[in-house]
């Protein structure tokens, strides 16, 4: 069986491609728009399609013969001024249309854990979360087998959040630093994507988080290997309002949702060690 991954050059995408190849998936097709990312993915063993995620004909052609298609576009880290609908919902609409045209059986998407928290009181007010909630609705209504992976903050090599928290003190912290988080290792998210491809007759929303719940202030200290000075701000430098709002809120597992069967979450200490953050201090 073949599996296709859009957003394959991103934090989760690259880890997912590597995890799927380790699982001996027959063909892993990685979709990227940046020519500079092609060589690295090919070295991993993936077949690479260079096209824009909003190109319906190109995506449908790339999906030919694919059983599972995984959409990893539309992350929180969009460019300043970018419309969340254009960055998140439109690529998902094109992705689902292409999947239907190509006869794809199953789709997998990642969504922020905060989508579930915000949805408890109606549609999310945060534009990024609202866009992700709309994508979840589209996936559920598509008639395709699917897995929606609601992830807490994802940490891994090259994580934008990790770079923010690892900045030279005093560290700019969105919010008051007391918000509770349970960061998940990017390798665990990749393993969940691989599990979703390998599960029979799937239609599920899974909750992905790390096993350790800490305050953001404690996470900053853990990243630095000890207590450091912090500035608590409504919006840290370089963040959009939507990004700062998400980071200033809790990011925890949804107790009403199951963790992917058979997977064991990675402890926070192991996650930070694997990112090499402490080695860079």
Predicted regions and their residues:
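N-terminal Rossmann NAD(P)H-binding glycine-rich loop of SDR-like oxidoreductase domains
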Residues: 2-26
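Conserved glycine-rich Rossmann-like NAD(P)H-binding loop of the short-chain dehydrogenase/reductase
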Residues: 25-34
């Amino acid at each position: 069986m073949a599996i296709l991954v859009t957003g394959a050059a991103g934090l989760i995408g690259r880890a997912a491609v590597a995890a799927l190849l380790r699982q001996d998936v027959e063909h892993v097709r990685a979709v990227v728009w940046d020519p500079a990312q092609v060589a690295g993915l090919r070295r991993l063993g993936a077949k690479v399609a260079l096209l824009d995620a909003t190109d319906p004909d190109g995506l449908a052609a790339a999906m030919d013969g694919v059983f599972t298609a995984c959409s990893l576009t539309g992350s929180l880290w969009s460019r300043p001024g970018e419309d969340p609908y254009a960055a998140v919902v439109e690529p998902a609409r094109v992705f689902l249309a292409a999947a239907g045209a190509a006869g794809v059986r199953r789709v997998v998407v990642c969504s922020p854990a905060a989508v579930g928290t915000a949805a408890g009181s109606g549609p999310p007010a945060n534009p990024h979360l609202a866009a992700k909630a709309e994508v979840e609705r589209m996936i559920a209504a598509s008639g395709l087998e699917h897995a929606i992976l609601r992830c807490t903050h994802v940490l891994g090599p090259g994580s934008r959040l990790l770079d923010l928290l690892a900045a030279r003190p005093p560290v700019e912290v969105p919010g008051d630093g007391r918000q509770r988080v349970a960061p998940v290792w990017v390798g665990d998210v990749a393993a969940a994507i691989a599990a979703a491809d390998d599960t029979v007759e799937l239609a599920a929303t899974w909750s992905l988080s790390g096993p350790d719940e800490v305050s953001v202030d404690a996470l900053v200290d853990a990243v630095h290997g000890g207590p450091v000075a912090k500035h608590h701000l409504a919006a840290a430098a370089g963040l959009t309002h939507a990004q700062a709002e998400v980071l200033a809120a809790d990011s925890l597992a949804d107790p009403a949702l199951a963790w992917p069967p058979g997977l064991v979450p990675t402890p926070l200490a192991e996650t930070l060690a694997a990112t090499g953050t402490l080695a860079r201090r």
